[in-house]
Amino acid sequence: EIPLRLVGSEMCIRDRENNMPKRTDIHKVLIIGSGPIIIGQACEFDYSGTQACKALRKLGYEIVLVNSNPATIMTDPETADVTYIEPLNVERLEQIIAKERPDALLPNLGGQSGLNLCSELNKAGILEKYNVEVIGVQVDAIERGEDRVEFKKAMDELGIEMARSEVAYSVDEALKIADELGYPVVLRPAYTMGGAGGGLVYNREELKTVCARGLQASLVGQVLVEESILGWEELELEIVRDADNNMITVCFIENIDPLGVHTGDSFCSAPMLTISEECQKRLQEQAYKIVESVQVIGGTNVQFAHDPVTDRIIVIEINPRTSRSSALASKATGFPIALVSAMLAAGLTLKDIPCGKYGTLDKYVPDGDY
């Protein structure tokens, strides 16, 4: 019997690679790396990109990797079939796509820069021009997950509560909205990594400074002005979904520090220690609804806020990609989220992947049996 921490490992894949169903209409896959290490985007994406390359090569695909940072594991010569150390921009990527002619692009394992580049390539018509299919996440799903307006619309349709908020495209608009909501307010720029350019503001002067910075940092010049939920509990779920809409929760993460401390700076525990079973069940039901509506294949990180006084739950945001939390969850549980996500993007389902004592991955539960 293969122990849990070897799920999807080389041993597992080697045992089954000959009879595993996978997509045969794609042969060459382009993976976008995460680029330089900056605050909020570090080695977790090198880890996930390397895992993806390993998994897809084991399944027989040819891998073309593009990354601007040579000081990574994923740019080692043996990780991909072809590796380009090039700037991560649309012009250079078009040249690489024209030369290599990949069948598919896997964007959700290279962090925020991978997702943003995929969106830009799509808008520029390059993916259509060279007939490149996006796997793992649909392009419109990136927008539903990352664009604050689209995400709010999607949540309203699902009947899932969010913090009261409105979108601003200028500092003046943001000032008006903040006056209506009452200070303090949170500013969240769209299409940024780790909340870059945003923050908590307590008065009009702070708002002017932070909002101007946020509008500049946002790929689409859009900032969400949101009611403050300072002091609530911040809770995260790592969900994995396949093409047949089977979903499993890999990990329940409780941030020890309350909302207001960035998740990247907060202590956290997996599994949750002080949250009731009933509350965890509600979180899981809502997370499944969200992941199904966004239709990501592979790992998604869903962040919630819970008011311990009123028991109100609201969704903060989702990351339709491997994230800092998924690297953390992988290490805490022994479940290789990035590796499994890559296999699912290649057309396998959770039922196809063997998993120790559970038999197959669709029966996995995060029982925290250490």
Task: Give names to the regions the model predicted.
Residues P36-I39, A141-I142, Y191-G194, R321-S325:
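A short, flexible beta-alpha/helix-coil linker loop
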Residues K123, Y130, L181, L219-V220:
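Accessory helical subdomains and C-terminal extensions of nucleic-acid helicases
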Residues S9, E17-I160, Y169-K176:
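ATP-binding N-terminal substructure of ATP-dependent carboxylate-amine bond-forming enzymes
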Residues S9, M20-P21, H27, D46, ...:
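ATP-dependent carboxylate activation and anion-phosphoryl transfer catalytic cores
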Residues E133-G136, E166-V171, L175, C355, ...:
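Internal, active-site/partner-interface "lid" segment
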Residues R164, V185, V223-L224:
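A short linear hydrophobic-aromatic micro-motif
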Residues E1-D15:
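Single conserved hydrophobic/aromatic residue that forms the stacking wall/gate
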Residues G182-A190:
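Conserved anion/nucleotide-ligand pocket segment
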